[in-house]
């Protein structure tokens, strides 16, 4: 018995002394190299490697290399991808509170949105994502600016969208929003959009200026109309399958670095918006600013009524944030 005990102790000592295997985390995003989200995540990876002496590293797969958002989320849920930055649309069905952030004209402006996601409400929504059946861990938020409609003609009021097929993200709330604004909302993946604009499958779409510019949509649609109908934060999540394989210290470190990435991405975002506006102007894009936002706000009230009826207290808290 004594000999067995010594062998057991020796084995335990060897196990404790053995170095932990290095782990390369796989991160993915639909946006190209140099995009604010990509840079912020790459910097997170560098900090992670430095803090763990390269025991934990990160490899970024940008530009839809691993598929569109829907595909990447599914891969993360299965443990095939570790970290994904995504829009909130796909989370609506499993975390109903997320749809509150997706409602048109919820936030007064981008500063209001940032104050909300930086505070208790932002943390609560991340916790709900983590606790949901999505098999993902909510790490942090990223700015995605203000979404505006881009088309082949100017849009100033709801009547101007009549007969226009406008691509929307894959969430019924967004399709309902465009229908209420006067257009015809078409749910479509991002990977299909450029060719669909070229061939006339859709007449336009809506997104922020950096995406409009980096995805070269301006080569097809020359009117960028400041409808300002959506100001939506985006979320980056960790596969819970992968997360549960990490020790508590590594989990805490990743959460800390994620909060830092959230703030860093914001600065990168603001700089990129200015750069994109300059590029759009140089490429001959007409930016329509004299939009009747009050008319669009009024037109989308039924959408807020429909999707916000169960979350009146949460909406009131959001609106109270200064």
Regions found by a protein language model. Give the residues of each.
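Sec/Tat signal peptide C-region and signal peptidase I cleavage site
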Residues: 16-22
């Amino acid at each position: 018995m004594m000999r067995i005990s010594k062998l057991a102790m020796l084995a335990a000592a060897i196990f404790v002394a053995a170095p932990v295997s290095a782990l390369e985390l796989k991160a993915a995003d639909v946006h190209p190299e140099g995009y604010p989200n990509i840079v912020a995540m790459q910097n997170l990876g560098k900090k992670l490697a430095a803090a763990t002496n390269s025991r934990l590293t990160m490899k970024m797969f940008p530009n839809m290399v691993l598929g569109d958002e829907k595909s990447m989320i599914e891969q993360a849920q299965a443990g095939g991808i570790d970290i994904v930055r995504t829009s909130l649309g796909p989370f609506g069905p499993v975390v109903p509170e997320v749809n509150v952030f997706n409602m048109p004209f919820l936030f007064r402006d981008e500063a209001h949105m940032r104050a909300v996601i930086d505070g208790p409400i932002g943390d609560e929504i991340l916790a709900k994502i983590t606790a949901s059946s999505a098999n993902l861990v909510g790490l942090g938020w990223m700015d995605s600016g203000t979404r505006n409609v881009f088309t082949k003609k100017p849009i100033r009021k709801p009547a101007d969208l009549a007969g226009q097929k406008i691509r929307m993200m894959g969430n019924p709330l967004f399709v309902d929003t465009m229908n209420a604004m006067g257009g015809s909302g078409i749910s479509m993946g991002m990977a299909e959009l450029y060719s669909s604009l070229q061939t006339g499958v859709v007449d336009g779409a809506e997104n922020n200026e950096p995406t409009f510019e980096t995805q070269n949509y301006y080569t097809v649609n020359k009117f960028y109309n400041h409808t300002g109908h959506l100001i939506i934060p985006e979320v980056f999540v960790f596969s819970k399958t992968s997360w549960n394989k990490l020790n508590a210290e590594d989990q805490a470190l990743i959460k800390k670095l994620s909060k830092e990435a959230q703030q860093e991405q914001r600065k990168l975002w603001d700089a990129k918006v200015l750069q994109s506006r300059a590029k759009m102007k140089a490429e001959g894009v007409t930016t329509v600013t004299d939009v009747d936002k009050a008319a669009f706000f009024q037109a989308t009230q039924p959408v807020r009524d429909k999707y916000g009826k169960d979350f009146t207290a949460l909406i009131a808290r959001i609106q109270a944030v200064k």
